[in-house]
Amino acid sequence: MFAEYINYHNEYTKRFGDHVIVLYQNGHFFEILASEDEGPNMEQITGLLNIVLTKRPSKNPNAIVPKMAGVQKDASKRHIDLLIENNYIVVIVEEITPSPNTTRAVTNVYSK
């Protein structure tokens, strides 16, 4: 999942510049992910949105443990609006097929 998130982040950052945030659906949440050297500035984003920054645990000791934050999908409009007001381009990646073989795709891109 992290690799797919970073692929979307890199693709849209190349297209639109550094002020891109990918909101990636995982169940009933939109997540934002990053590692120490890839992805958005999580401290800046979580501060702006007033949401908690955490890490996703892994049973694999060699795995990348990404920084993550999330917002409930049903309450995401105000977060999207706040990002847009602060000159971010917001890329929405939603689940388009159900579990267990979930596939995701970009469904919207929002900007000023």
Predicted features, each with a name:
Residues 1-112:
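Basic, polar low-complexity surface loops/patches
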